[in-house]
Curated annotation (Swiss-Prot):
Designated gene of the protein: astB
Matching Gene3D superfamilies: Succinylarginine dihydrolase (3.75.10.20)
Subunit structure: Homodimer.
Pfam assignment, any one: AstB
GO biological process, one term: arginine catabolic process to glutamate
Gene Ontology molecular function: N-succinylarginine dihydrolase activity
Family: Belongs to the succinylarginine dihydrolase family.
Species: Salmonella typhimurium (strain LT2 / SGSC1412 / ATCC 700720)
Protein name per Swiss-Prot or TrEMBL: N-succinylarginine dihydrolase
Length: 447
C-alpha cells in the first residue's frame, strides 16, 4: 500500500527561554541565562516547515503547551491566585518557575513513539506518548501531549494513541528520539530499531551523564504499539557518547528507509547491529562517519546527525541540516564529500534554527515522523496540515502574541501568563483542537 512520511513539527512556545534545565544536553547548559527571542524562534520553525512543504514533503504542526504551567506549582504546594503563585515562586523558588515555563514540548521527537500500520499487528497507526521521566520539566508534558495527539489523530478506527508509561526511572522513555524505522517503501513492513541507554542488571552505562532511555521502556512501547515482534531490534547506545553529550540517539544517528546515517561510535556493539540490519533490511546501507573526519564532540556541537533525512520523489534523499553544520569547516567539508559520493544522500538544505539549537534542539528534535497511507492521512485533523493559508495565519498569530525578548525574570510577569492563554485559545480554534489545555477545561484564569 502506498504511504508517505508526514513530518509533524512542534511550534515553539511563547515562554521559550534559556534556563539550562537539561543536564546532559551541553547546548542547554552552555546557553543558560542568555536572552531568548520567542518570536524569532517560532518563525524559524515555521520557515522550515513551509520550505519543506513547498518542496513536496508533507508537513503538519503540533501546538505548544500551556506555560507557565500553574497546576504543577499547585502540586508543589504553592497557593493563591495564579498571579499570587507566580509572585511567590519567583521570590522563593525561581528554578521551579523556569521549569514549569519551559518550552521543551516544541521538541516533538520526544512526544511519542510511532508505529505505522504496516508494522502493527492490528493494522492501525499507533502512537505511545513518552513519559520523559528523566527531567522534571519534561515529565510534565505527557498528559497534554496525549490530549493534543488525540485531537490530531482523532479517528479511532485508524489511530491508537496510548498513554505514557508509569513515571518511574525503570521505565524512562524519550519517544521517537530513540527510535528509527528502516525498510523499503514507506507502505511496506519495516524494521523498527529501538535504542536504549541502560537496562536493569546491565552494568554497561554512562558514568558522567544520565542514560534517559531504558530497555524496559523500549520493550513496553513496542508492545503497546503492537509492533510485530519479528520486526523489532533493540540496541544499546554507546555509553561513551552519552557521556560526551549525546543524550538522545537522534544526536548521533538518523535513518530513512534503507539508509542509516550515523557516527562510527554511535552504538555499543555497532558491528553486530549493522550486520543484523544488513540481514533484515533489503538494500540496507550504513553510512558510518569516521571519528577522523568528524569527532563526536563536533557532531554534538553542530548537530550533524540531528538532521532530517527525507526521500524525494526521484528516489534520492535530502539531508536537512542546521546552519551550525555549514559554519563548521570540517563538518561542511565532510558533507560536501558525502553528497558527491555514490549513495542515496544527494542534496542538502540548511536552515537557521539558532533559537532552538541554543537549547539543544536541531531539525530532527523539532519533528515527529508519522508514516501514513492516503486513507490515514485523510483521517488526520486537516486543520494542522501546513499550507499557504496556515503559514500566513500562524505568522500573524505569532506577531500578535510572541515577545521578541525574554529572560528568566520575565516569567513571573502575570501578563505573560495571560498572553499565553489567550494565544492558545486562539490557536485551538485555528487548528480545530477543542479544549485540550487545562486552563480551558477549568474555565477560570485564577485557581
Amino acid at each position: 500500500m502506498t504511504a508517505h512520511e508526514v513530518n509533524f513539527d512542534g511550534l515553539v512556545g511563547l515562554t521559550h527561554h534559556y534556563a539550562g534545565l537539561s543536564f546532559g544536553n551541553e547546548a542547554s547548559t552552555r546557553h543558560r541565562f542568555q536572552v531568548s527571542n520567542p518570536r524569532l524562534a517560532v518563525k524559524q520553525g515555521l520557515l522550515k516547515m513551509k520550505a519543506l512543504a513547498d518542496a513536496g514533503f508533507p508537513q503538519a504542526v503540533i501546538p505548544p503547551h500551556e506555560r507557565p504551567f500553574i497546576p504543577a506549582l499547585r502540586q508543589l504546594g504553592f497557593t493563591g491566585s495564579d498571579e499570587q503563585i507566580l509572585d511567590k515562586v519567583a521570590r522563593q523558588a525561581p528554578r521551579w518557575l523556569s521549569s514549569v515555563s519551559s518550552a521543551s514540548p516544541m521538541w516533538v521527537a520526544n512526544a511519542a513513539t510511532v508505529c505505522p500500520s504496516a508494522d502493527a499487528l492490528d493494522g492501525k497507526v499507533h502512537l505511545t506518548v513518552a513519559n520523559l521521566n528523566n527531567k522534571f520539566h519534561r515529565a510534565l508534558e505527557a498528559p497534554v501531549t496525549e490530549a493534543l495527539l488525540r485531537a490530531i489523530f482523532r479517528d479511532e478506527s485508524q489511530f491508537s494513541v496510548h498513554s505514557a508509561l508509569p513515571q518511574v526511572a525503570l521505565l524512562g522513555d524519550e519517544g521517537a528520539a530513540n527510535h528509527n524505522r528502516l525498510g523499503g517503501e514507506y507502505g511496506s513492513a519495516g524494521v523498527q530499531l529501538f535504542v536504549y541507554g541502560r537496562e536493569e542488571e546491565n552494568e554497561i552505562r554512562p558514568a558522567r551523564y544520565p542514560a534517559r532511555q531504558s530497555r524496559e521502556a523500549s520493550e513496553a512501547v513496542a508492545r503497546l504499539n503492537q509492533v510485530n515482534p519479528q520486526q523489532v531490534i533493540f540496541a544499546q547506545q554507546n555509553p561513551e557518547v552519552i557521556d560526551q553529550g549525546v543524550f538522545h540517539n537522534d544526536v548521533i544517528a538518523v535513518s530513512n528507509r534503507q539508509v542509516l546515517f550515523c557516527h562510527e561510535a554511535a552504538f555499543a556493539r555497532q558491528k553486530v547491529l549493522i550486520n543484523q540490519l544488513r540481514t533484515r533490511v533489503d538494500g540496507f546501507m550504513a553510512i558510518e562517519v569516521p571519528a577522523g573526519e568528524v569527532s563526536v564532540s563536533d557532531a554534538v556541537a553542530t548537530y550533524l546527525f540531528n538532521s532530517q533525512l527525507l526521500s524525494r520523489n526521484d528516489g534520492l534523499m535530502l539531508l536537512v541540516l542546521p546552519r551550525e553544520c555549514q559554519d563548521h569547516v570540517g563538518v561542511w567539508r565532510y558533507l560536501n564529500k558525502l553528497v558527491a559520493e555514490d549513495n542515496p544522500i544527494s542534496a542538502m538544505q540548511v536552515f537557521d534554527l539558532r533559537e532552538s539549537m541554543a537549547n539543544g534542539g536541531g531539525p530532527a528534535c523539532l519533528r515527529l515522523r508519522v508514516v501514513l497511507t492516503e486513507e490515514e492521512r485523510r483521517a488526520v485533523n486537516p486543520a494542522v496540515m501546513m499550507n499557504d493559508a496556515l503559514f500566513t495565519a500562524l505568522n500573524a498569530w505569532a506577531d500578535r502574541y510572541y515577545r521578541d525578548r525574554l529572560t528568566a525574570a520575565d516569567l513571573a510577569d502575570p501578563l505573560l501568563l495571560r498572553e499565553g492563554r489567550e494565544a492558545l485559545d486562539v490557536l485551538t480554534r485555528l487548528l480545530d483542537l477543542g479544549s485540550v489545555y487545562p486552563f480551558q477545561q477549568t474555565g477560570a484564569a485564577d485557581g
